[in-house]
Regions:
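Helix-adjacent hinge/juxtasegments
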Residues: 46, 50-86
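Short, structured coil segments at secondary-structure junctions
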Residues: 26, 79-80, 100
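Extreme N-terminal starter segment of soluble prokaryotic enzymes
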Residues: 2-6
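C-terminal binding/interaction regions
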Residues: 9, 13-16, 90-147
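Short, solvent-exposed amphipathic alpha-helices that sit
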Residues: 13-26
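Short hydrophobic/aromatic-enriched beta-strand-loop microsegments
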Residues: 29-32, 82-89
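A short beta-strand-loop structural module common to alpha/beta enzyme folds
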Residues: 29-41
Length: 147
């Protein structure tokens, strides 16, 4: 097992799923960046908190949950140094980390508890492959932040 600090954030639709994940990620240090209830909120507020935590080194990896995972993913990917993949299955969780070196995953609250837990475990424990073509491509993506 790799020791990492995990940041987790959700909007109101992802709140219940976030709580389930927190309860099951006891092997890791998990920091919750909100929201704290099912009251309606604006997802960019919580995406930004999670993104800042990664940028500042408070956490190593992030998990974002909203209705579809799309909104959180879009918001997080606007932030420099954040590489968020919207994932729906274990294969995507593995590939986003091993090929793209993603540091955040965004998921839909509609996923089953079992699927979410499998996705998160694979994301956390999959290393970046360091294959030359993936390093080159990831460097090209990083350069886009300067355009």
């Amino acid at each position: 097992m790799i020791f990492v600090k995990i940041g987790i954030a959700s909007d109101h639709r992802g709140y219940k799923a976030k709580q389930i994940l927190k309860d099951n990620l006891y092997k890791y240090e998990v920091i919750d960046y909100g929201t704290d209830s099912e009251d309606s909120v604006d997802f960019p507020v919580y995406a930004k908190k999670l993104g800042f935590a990664i940028q500042n080194g408070e956490v190593d990896l992030g998990i974002a949950i909203c209705g579809t995972g799309i909104g959180m993913s879009i918001a997080l990917n606007k932030m420099k140094g954040i590489y968020c993949a919207k994932v729906s299955n274990v294969s995507e969780a593995v590939l986003c980390k091993s090929h793209n070196n993603a540091n955040v995953i965004a998921m839909s609250e509609d996923l089953s508890e079992d699927d979410m837990l499998k996705i998160v475990e694979k994301f956390i424990n999959t290393p970046f492959s360091n294959v030359i073509k993936y390093v080159r491509r990831n460097n090209m993506v990083s350069e886009l932040e300067n355009d």
